[in-house]
């Protein structure tokens, strides 16, 4: 009898344990299902990259949008990961760095100094200068930074240091508390994300912007000696980041990602030089380096770079890290497949944006990557001739001022841009383009006052321009695969906007 009772007790205990395990599993799956996936989409690859990454890129959205790990690896073999966060003030950057070091210790840290002037620690308090909307946005942005990291000692320390309200801190410990109401808005990506299937467009943490802001304001450059001298919480936490680097034997490099900043922002950026001097480390203020970017073609907004600006900035930074700092070249070494895959994803992303651009500005910007071959046709007297930003983007491709010459002639303009054969040919007045050899065939173009003929291949009478359905279109762009020579796209634009077929 005693044996039977003992067996029943054991059975009850086992059933209770099994029930608790099933309950925990269901809660875990529900938590993963309803969470917003942006944090794991942004930094999910970090945990695989951490043991191999030589460089961590830290900072605000300027870092996310401005430094591309795929460019660093493709051009220089630099194995990096972009841990920048939207709206990251330096206290957030510090704690993200602390949590990241639980998974790997890089040899180098590149730290963007933007938002150095911010003088608050608690995101849910801030100062009188910020609104409730600012505080709410900061908490949302912190979720994107921190949700990917498992809850533990350092995440708990981050929340205690960054959020004063204990109820808000609990949301970060259990995503289900914050996101339980998302059941009605779940999408396919939410279910795939439960099982770790990758989603989204981040490239090793970088998020590239394939748009152009043609209305960026430009400001005179202030002298580097003009600085923001006030002590701030931002400066305190930058020093904490540098102290942590010293403790972990990580070599830090301070940077200012370039953009068209006003005079006050320039003075704030310049003040990072004093902290760099204090620690005896480099400060690369790229706003004082000539010709890294052209703000009129390389920015997505007044303060953020687009994908082309990011490529240029990353190429400049990579050259410095490689030749002057001594970051190793990992190309050809085993174990860096994650970076090789990121390079492939990057180029696939470029082509996808070429074939489905936001507008004509975005299209011309993205064609600068030379991932496709193209023919650009502008109809006679098109508004595109009178848009200075569009002309600058075309001149980036052609390498000449030919588009300026053609503006106002009442004649069509044609540019043949073929990176495979290094061909850049454009119309000059009424002189036809004859027998231009390209990777996708022989091109001929004739422009008349009321008609233009573009042929590709042997049949010189077959017009590749669509005059039947789109004769009044401002701009037509033909896109060719550089490997096969096949036409993969024919895009139409009116008044700068994409006309979808």
Predicted region positions:
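N-terminal Lys/Arg-rich, disordered targeting/topogenic segments
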Residues: 1-10
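Hydrophobic membrane-insertion alpha-helices, especially the h-region
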Residues: 11-31
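Alpha-helical transmembrane signal-anchor/signal-peptide segments
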Residues: 32-53
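Membrane-embedded segments
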Residues: 58, 62-152
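Secreted/periplasmic serine-hydrolase-like ester/acetyl group-modifying domain
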Residues: 128-248, 329-350
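Active-site segments of SGNH/GDSL-like serine hydrolases
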Residues: 239-265
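Short acidic-hydrophobic catalytic motif
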Residues: 351-374, 378-501
């Amino acid at each position: 009898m005693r044996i039977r009772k003992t067996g029943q007790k054991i059975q009850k205990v086992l059933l209770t344990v099994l029930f608790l395990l099933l309950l925990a599993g269901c809660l875990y799956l529900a938590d993963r299902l309803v969470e917003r996936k942006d944090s794991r989409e942004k930094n999910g690859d970090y945990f695989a990259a951490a043991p191999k990454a030589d460089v961590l890129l830290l900072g605000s959205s300027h870092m996310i949008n401005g430094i591309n790990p795929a460019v660093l690896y493709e051009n220089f073999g630099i194995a990096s990961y972009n841990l920048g966060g939207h709206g990251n003030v330096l206290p957030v950057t510090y704690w993200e760095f602390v949590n990241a070091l639980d998974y790997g210790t890089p040899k180098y840290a590149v730290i963007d100094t933007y938002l150095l002037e911010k003088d608050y620690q608690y995101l849910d308090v801030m100062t009188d200068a910020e609104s409730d909307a600012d505080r709410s946005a900061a908490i949302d942005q912190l979720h994107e930074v921190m949700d990917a990291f498992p809850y533990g000692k350092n995440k708990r320390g981050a929340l205690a240091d960054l959020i004063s309200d204990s109820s808000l801190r609990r949301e970060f410990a259990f995503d289900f508390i914050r996101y339980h109401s998302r059941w009605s808005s779940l999408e396919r990506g939410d279910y795939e994300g439960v099982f770790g299937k990758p989603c989204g467009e981040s490239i090793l943490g970088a998020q590239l912007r394939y748009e152009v802001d043609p209305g960026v304001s430009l400001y005179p450059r202030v002298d580097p000696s003009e600085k923001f001298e006030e002590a701030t919480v931002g400066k305190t936490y930058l020093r904490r980041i540098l102290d942590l680097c010293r403790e972990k034997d990580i070599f830090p490099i301070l940077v200012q990602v370039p953009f068209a900043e006003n005079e006050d922002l320039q003075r704030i950026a310049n003040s990072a030089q004093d902290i760099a001097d204090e620690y005896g480390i480099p400060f690369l203020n790229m706003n004082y380096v000539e010709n890294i970017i052209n703000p009129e073609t390389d920015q997505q907004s007044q303060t953020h770079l687009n994908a082309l600006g990011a490529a240029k900035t990353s190429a400049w930074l990579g050259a410095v890290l490689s030749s002057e700092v001594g970051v190793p070249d990992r190309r050809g070494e085993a174990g860096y497949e994650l970076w090789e895959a990121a390079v492939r994803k990057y180029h696939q992303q470029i082509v996808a944006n070429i074939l489905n651009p936001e507008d004509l500005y975005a299209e011309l910007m993205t064609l600068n990557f030379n991932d496709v071959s193209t023919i650009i046709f502008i109809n006679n007297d098109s508004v595109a001739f009178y848009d200075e930003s569009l002309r600058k983007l075309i001149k980036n491709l052609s390498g000449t001022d030919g588009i300026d010459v053609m503006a106002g002639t009442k004649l069509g303009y044609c540019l043949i841009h073929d990176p495979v054969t290094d061909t850049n040919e454009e119309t000059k007045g009424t002189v036809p383009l004859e027998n231009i050899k390209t990777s996708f065939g022989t091109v001929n173009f004739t422009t008349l006052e009321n008609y233009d003929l573009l042929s590709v291949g042997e049949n010189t009478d077959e017009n590749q321009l669509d005059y039947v359905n789109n004769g009044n279109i401002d701009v037509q762009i033909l896109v060719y695969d550089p490997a096969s020579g096949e036409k993969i796209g024919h895009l139409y634009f009116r008044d700068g906007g994409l006309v979808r077929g």
